[in-house]
């Protein structure tokens, strides 16, 4: 009763309420999927595909306006891959690194900009997909598969010789490193996105409208940095797996 009266007194409280650990479950056989994560992820993917189509449907030799912006984004993402993977090996990995960056950025910004709490769900609430640990772990495991594939495609079975370099004594540590990389990637992204949403929610609860705006702007900046860090580290891990096999 007290909680309902508080929400009636201050309607912003309903927007600032945070539901942690509650999910809208979709059941497919014996599997339980987090429905709200898929809904927002599909919206982000649809938005990215739409922007890509609009930016490439009428390409001009001399780019103007939106095409110029899209080419700037592409060059920025190419530079990330080139700097981390190497000038001779980076091109095949640009689509993967670019997809990682744009998807994470879109998910983070979707959580920071769109008032999802206005959309009522039977259970849980819509939010940034990256504030769900399952999403960040899945992205991290994709990066793990990517750098294993990169190493094996360049070195063959000789890739596994890295585990006993520079000395076989380091074998356990080198194996452990392959587990810590995806763990650090996933928990860093998950923790920062969740913390940002919690901070904005708390400030909105305490002082509505005015004070949360600078915090939201800071959250957008932090969300962009997290997307950059994740994609840069992913490219660095791929480059490390292929190290020593570029052309001189």
From Swiss-Prot:
The keyword Membrane applies. It comes from the Eukaryota. The chain crosses the membrane at residues 35-55, 94-114, 133-153, 202-222, 224-244. Pfam families: ATP-synt_A (PF00119). The keyword Aminoacyl-tRNA synthetase does not apply. One of its GO terms (cellular component) is chloroplast thylakoid membrane. GO terms for molecular function: proton-transporting ATP synthase activity, rotational mechanism. It is found in: Plastid, Chloroplast thylakoid membrane. Key component of the proton channel; it plays a direct role in the translocation of protons across the membrane. F-type ATPases have 2 components, CF(1) - the catalytic core - and CF(0) - the membrane proton channel. CF(1) has five subunits: alpha(3), beta(3), gamma(1), delta(1), epsilon(1). CF(0) has four main subunits: a, b, b' and c. NCBIfam families: ATP_synt_6_or_A (TIGR01131). This is ATP synthase subunit a, chloroplastic. It comes from Pyropia yezoensis. The gene is atpI.
């Amino acid at each position: 009763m007290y909680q309902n009266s508080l929400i009636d007194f201050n309607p912003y409280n309903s927007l600032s309420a945070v539901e942690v650990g509650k999910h809208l479950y979709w059941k497919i056989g014996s599997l339980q999927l987090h429905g709200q994560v898929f809904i927002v992820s599909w919206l982000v993917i649809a938005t990215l595909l739409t922007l890509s189509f609009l930016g490439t449907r009428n390409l001009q030799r001399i780019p103007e306006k939106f095409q110029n912006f899209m080419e700037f984004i592409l060059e920025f993402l190419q530079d990330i891959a080139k700097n981390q993977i190497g000038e001779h090996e980076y091109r095949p990995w640009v689509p993967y690194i670019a997809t990682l960056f744009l998807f994470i950025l879109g998910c983070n910004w979707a959580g920071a900009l769109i008032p999802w709490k206005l959309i009522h769900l039977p259970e849980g609430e819509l939010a940034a997909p990256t504030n769900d640990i399952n999403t960040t772990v899945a992205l991290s495991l994709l990066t793990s598969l990517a750098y294993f594939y990169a190493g094996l495609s360049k070195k063959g079975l000789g890739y596994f010789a890295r585990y006993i370099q520079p000395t076989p004594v380091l074998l356990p540590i080198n194996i452990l490193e392959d587990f810590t990389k995806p763990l650090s990637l996933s928990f860093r992204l998950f923790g920062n996105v969740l913390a940002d949403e919690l901070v904005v929610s708390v400030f909105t609860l305490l002082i509505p409208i005015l004070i949360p705006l600078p915090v939201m702007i800071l959250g957008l900046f932090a969300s962009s940095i997290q997307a950059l860090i994740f994609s840069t580290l992913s490219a660095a891990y791929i480059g490390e797996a292929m190290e020593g096999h570029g052309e001189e």
